[in-house]
């Protein structure tokens, strides 16, 4: 499927994210490593715009974590020619098993709903590299590393770099994450900071060879399935990636670091062991395999919904405007939907003077949906982390009866899946644009 070309090719700047250094390991400061920004560069590049991506890092680094590529995201990558690169490295899930925290008792097995397409999982670096490779293969997309943005102008658009350079353009896209510099300038409010949710996550990646020695662990990495263990104030999600050569494990738990500013910290192996003391023996086996120096802990943060995502010829996308908790696996997907919507509206204009108006259509197309998805993640956290007791017993009974499609875990619930996975961000943006143009024509005839 050929991507439609823009009526007016624009000069677009995409501002990426900063890195925090942890010894010899570099970890991006937010959950998704520049996926939204690179997706914006790709879709705009395919439509004929000239795109410069500015990354603050001197070199893009691999981030050791997995990601779920949900159908609403994969649908867009299909159109943009990235799917073959993704499928060369992914695992297509067939089932998700939900187990009790202490004894591993199976609470329910849900087949993956393929009504809206495949649900695949992949190493974040493999996904990021697939998008980068596809984008940078275009002659009109370039990536400039070691380019830290310190200021932005809104109309006409430009960015100032730490080295004193000023780059002028038609549009600036702020894809610089939950600690966004562009957002602070856009809102003229530096008080909108990430707020700790009280949760944190360990993310570990285990190589196949160390799991093959135990038959139970070998089965986990061999099968095209995700496993979720749920318990009081905690849960774990795990699945194979990189064609079953790595096993991704995310362990969510109460944050013990208080108001510490760092988004990512080196974690303690002993603290991880203590956090999951008394959990299923399979969980403890997985934790035992983790190298003492490979424990990284992510603080899960949000900020309150913004009054606006746009100003002049500047727009925010992804975690810069709607950071997501990982409980419905939509953080990267919503950033990619933002990118898709921008690609549509910026390619529909007939003159540069329409850019601010196009961005207002982008916001109308995206803001309510993204913030609704954001809220659904927060709600799912409560369900998954119930303490043992009457509510937990009732929830577990629902898992057993979930063959009907109604599921207490929103990720596996059919109605929630239809809302999340059935959405076509490009169609929604085009519909919003066409409705807007129809209203403009109607008003002109009054």
What is the role of each PLM region?
Residues 2-10, 26, 106, 285, ...:
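C-terminal helical "tail/cap" subdomain of flavin- and related membrane-associated enzymes
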Residues 64, 80-81, 90, 110, ...:
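Short, flexible helix/strand-to-coil boundary loops that buttress conserved ligand/catalytic motifs
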Residues 55-58, 108-115, 254-258:
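Short glycine/proline- and charge-enriched loop/turn segments
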Residues 48, 81, 140:
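Short glycine-rich hinge loops at helix-strand junctions in the catalytic core
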Residues 9, 14-24, 30-57, 173-174, ...:
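Conserved mid-domain beta->alpha element of the FAD-binding
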Residues 97, 103, 130-292:
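Conserved FAD-binding catalytic core of PHBH/FMO-like flavoproteins
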Residues 62-134, 150, 230, 384-386, ...:
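Active-site-adjacent segment of FAD-dependent monooxygenases/related oxidoreductases
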Residues 2-13, 26-28, 56, 60-72:
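Accessory recognition modules or surfaces
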């Amino acid at each position: 499927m050929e991507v439609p070309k823009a009526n007016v090719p624009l000069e677009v700047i995409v501002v990426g994210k900063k890195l925090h250094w942890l010894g010899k390991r570099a970890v991006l400061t937010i959950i998704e490593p520049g996926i939204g920004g690179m997706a914006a560069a790709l879709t705009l590049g395919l439509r004929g715009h000239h795109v410069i991506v500015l990354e603050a890092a001197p070199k893009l680094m691999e981030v050791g974590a997995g990601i779920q590529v949900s159908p609403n995201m994969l649908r867009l990558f299909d159109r943009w020619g990235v799917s073959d690169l993704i499928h060369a490295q992914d695992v297509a899930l067939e089932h998700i098993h939900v187990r009790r925290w202490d004894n591993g008792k199976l609470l329910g097995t849900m087949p993956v709903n393929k009504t809206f397409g495949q649900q695949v999982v992949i190493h974040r670096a493999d996904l990021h590299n697939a998008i980068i490779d596809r984008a940078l293969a275009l002659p009109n997309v370039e990536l400039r590393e070691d380019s830290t943005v310190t200021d932005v102008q809104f109309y006409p658009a430009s960015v100032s770099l730490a080295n004193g350079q000023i780059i002028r353009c038609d549009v600036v896209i702020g894809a610089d994450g939950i600690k966004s510099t562009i957002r602070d300038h856009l809102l003229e409010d530096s008080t909108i900071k990430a707020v700790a949710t009280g949760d944190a996550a360990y993310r570990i990646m285990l190589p196949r060879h160390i799991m093959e020695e135990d038959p139970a662990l070998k089965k986990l990495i061999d099968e095209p399935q995700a496993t979720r263990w749920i318990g009081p104030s905690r849960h774990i999600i795990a699945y194979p990636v990189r064609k079953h050569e790595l096993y991704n494990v995310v362990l969510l738990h109460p944050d013990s670091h208080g108001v510490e500013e760092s988004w990512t910290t080196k974690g303690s192996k002993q603290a991880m062991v203590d956090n999951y003391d008394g959990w299923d023996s399979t969980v403890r086996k997985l934790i035992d395999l983790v190298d003492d120096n490979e424990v990284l802990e992510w603080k899960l943060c949000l900020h309150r919904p913004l009054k606006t995502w746009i100003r002049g010829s500047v727009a925010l996308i992804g975690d810069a405007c709607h950071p997501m908790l990982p409980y419905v696996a939509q953080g990267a997907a919503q950033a990619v939907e933002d990118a898709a919507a921008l690609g549509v509206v910026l390619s529909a204009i007939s003159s540069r003077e329409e850019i601010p108006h196009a961005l207002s259509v982008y916001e109308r197309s995206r803001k309510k949906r993204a913030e609704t998805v954001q809220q659904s993640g927060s709600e799912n956290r409560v369900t998954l982390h119930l303490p043992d007791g009457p509510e937990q017993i009732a929830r577990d009974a629902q898992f057993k009866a979930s063959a009907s499609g109604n599921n207490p875990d929103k990720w596996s619930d059919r109605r929630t899946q239809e809302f999340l996975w059935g959405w076509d961000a490009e169609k929604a943006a085009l519909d919003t644009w066409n409705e807007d143009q129809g209203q403009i024509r109607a008003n002109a005839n009054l």
